[in-house]
Amino acid sequence: MNKSHAQKVIAIFMVIAMMFGALSVIPASAADSDSGADAAYADSTQVSEAHKEMFGTYNRTLAEIEDMINAISYHDYNLKYAEVPKAEQTVVIRAADYIPEETTAEVEVLHDYEGVPGPSLKMGPTGKTTWHVNIPKTGRYAMRITYIPYVGETVTTIERMLYIDGKLPFSEARYLYFPRSWEYVLNEDGSFDIDIVGNDIRPIRQQRPIWNTYFLRDWLGFTIDPFEFYFTEGDHTITFVGAREPIIISTIELYRYEPEMSYEEYVEYYKSKGAKIIETTEPIKVQAENPYLVSNACLYPTNDRTSALTEPQDPAVIKYNILNSSVVNQWMRYKVTVPESGFYTIAARFRQNSLIGMFTSRRIKINGEIPFREASFLRFKYSPDWQSKPLNDGYTDFMFYLEKGENIIEFEVVLGHMVDYVYRVGQLVRELNAAYQQFVMLTGPTPDAYRDYGFTRVIPGAVRTIGKAAEELYQIADELEAITGELGDQVATLNTHAMLFETMAEDEYEIAPNFVTFKNYIIATSNWLYASLDQPLKLDYFVIQGVNDPLPPGKANFFQAAWFEISAFFMSFTMDYTTIGYRYDAVDGKQIDYRGEVEMWIVSILGRDDALIQRYLIDNYFTPYSNIAVKIKVISAGLTEAILAGIGPDIANMNSTDTITWGLREAVEPLNDKEGFDDVITWFDDAAITPLTMENAKGEVLTYGLPTVMAFYMMFYRVDTLAELGLEIPRTWDDLYTILPVLQNKHMQIGLPTGLAGTNIFLYQLGGELYADGGRRINLGSNIALEAFQKLADMFRKYSCPVNYDISWFRTAQMPILIADAIGTYNTLMGFSELRGLWEMAPLLGFKQDDGSINITSPVTVTSVVIPRGATDPDATWEYMKWYTSEETQIRLAKEQLNVSPNPTTKYNTANINALLSLAWTEDEYKAVSTQLKYLVGIPEYPGSYIVPVHVNNAFLSVYNDGANPITAMQDRIIDIDKEISRKRKEFKMDYLEISYRDSYAVESKPEDNLAS
């Protein structure tokens, strides 16, 4: 949408004003009376005050919102000041010299910290810290920070925002990330631990806090060089605003940045100093899986069995023999000792079989310095096979000067020559999304293919955007084909998208018929962008060798490959690849006498990753302290059958429905009599325990499992879209009803759960319950339940909310408000880089109560850990369950889940409340999540409960598809639900109600009259 700057400012002012209750939302109907408007104003003010107490996270200033919406990109910022000369001298700011009266962060001045003399400043994870700086001369200054990470409870990436003179210089300054340093914990000889089977054990990655000097740059990799900031001569302020994690800073330097010398200049420079070329020497091989430092804990060694030449290799057991990296700005460092100074060739054995027809890029640093300009553009071309090549940029094989003795060689993941193309495609995606929104506002998401909308007359700018995108994509595809020398998948994808965009731009009557495909191609273009941001490379080893020495072999010959495959085939008959055994069963040759042993089966679609995390935690934090061994098996299916047959594992995970059903069948053990049970359940919200607890046929109220993961609903919204439309962020359903006409007028949608999930949200917020009479019958016939179902149905019938949608609707702003699973949706959205800063999460919408509070209750679903019938040692299993679900272990588990995720902000949906709140949330995220956690409800599981979602979903679909009356549609299914509940209760020998089709529970009755035993 094209708006003037004045229009945007007015829209932003309206948002701020409404946030503070200064304005009400404009009534949907112009016919509203003055008194109605006054009432709406008073009501809005009252709700706003209640929200301030409950939510309290949306107090942005007008300037902050304006910065967020209007901040230019660094690309445009750099062009704007391109003619400004570079800095002539360095300006150093001591971090300890902050301005106290302009600092809100928790700060502490440290002295001589970790070997750095003088003062340094520790800053908390949130709040702002401001410094004064005097600039001697107007110019462009790069900025580098000398810092050390603070080792605390959480270990996500350190994140800050940068403001200069109180303003955001460009949009990328909102996301500055400071990497940590990690090291592997290895045996004294540098080898990995092995388990009792002989497989390598993934090494522990422990944080190694060291001082770093880091130049500020784009964390997504859209720039190879550091940011350059424009400063005028005179006094200025620099402010860091904390988003995640504490940090300790020694100095902030503003300096003149100059690109490195060229490769030719580099060679000539060292030759002029007498450096010689090492023609031949004994090769120095460095195994990639053994770096001495890495930037992310998710950079861990993995196993490759695709080649007999990968080192080390074993046809029988798992050996970690490669390092696989892909995320921009990740790095790994290696120590290399050379016998003499001179120019060497660095050759790598690698495999890049992911980006077909393309190359991935790396930057090499030697002793902390980029040796020459081309060293930031190393290429590793596509091939399905392993390769062995000297480091090169696609044109030249490089030599590198190394000093005699120890050298540090660092490989960093960069976009290399793809930087310009990725940036251009990113800009196109943003422009195409804006054009798509304009089309949707005119036609809706599914325009009539035979209608003349007059696109070129009504929204000519959007049509021109499509044409421009086609031209740009064709040009990018041609340039990529030229530099790669082939028409790969990625180039072909761009050409395909360009063809459609070209067709639509040249003939406006092709827009409506191809509109759905147009949307899909925008998403596909965005996915192309993400694929390009990913720079996968499997590295086996690299060799420091003479420039004339032969390269190490890349691909195994026929006999090597055949022998390896034959050996692996015969070994497969004797090796157990499903068991991930404990680290040792003997110490100094003496068998360990464990006091208990637990066997656990993991059904994992993620392969061995989940099991390896469990193995690491158990071996380091459970077995050494409990003297209980845990055996882990990774299986693909068969858990249910094994447990029911009594031959399953000692511990298992299952959903709440199965937990109760199997508990009633005595297939899993109740936990109430276990030692410490009453204390353990206090670790969880009552809502998480309720679905795992039930009264059995003997009248005993028993809990059959402990919750491990928990899902609940929250609201996600597009800040930019609501601000641009001048709409306040809704807090109640009434707020939503008020803004829906505005959204619908723009053909925008709201995302809501359907069927039983959606019904339960309204039902429990209105004060109802799903079951009545202790689970003997369904409560959907009550007035509250029927009202809840009516409200859900109205959202889809009257307000046309879509039944089928996906996260891409939110991504394109076609759906600016989405109610969905909190943690899963959060993790997904954090992966969409183009949405950085454009969305937020908030507590669920709710109903205002008489006291002015808002009921934002969210139903909860849980997965539990249980003790199956036939467990060999239930007491040992219970000890493991207590340890596993404890706050300390769940925090460690969350860290390990983060360590295997390339997304530095990934969250783990633990059911342990304290552990969940201990994750590295931003201040606003923490307030939103902690607020929602106060309003959770667990829905009990009863015999026959499996049938409820089937009938409720059918009732919902009959209303949505066939136009049935919601009340009638629900009432028609109540008897069938009750009959199934009674049938299952009878099967379990529990009290039940005799149900007939003549019975009706729409009116008050005494269920005891129909009670049977």
For each feature predicted by the language model, list its residue ranges:
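Conserved N-terminal structural module of periplasmic/extracytoplasmic solute-binding proteins
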Residues: 37, 41, 421-427, 432-661, ...
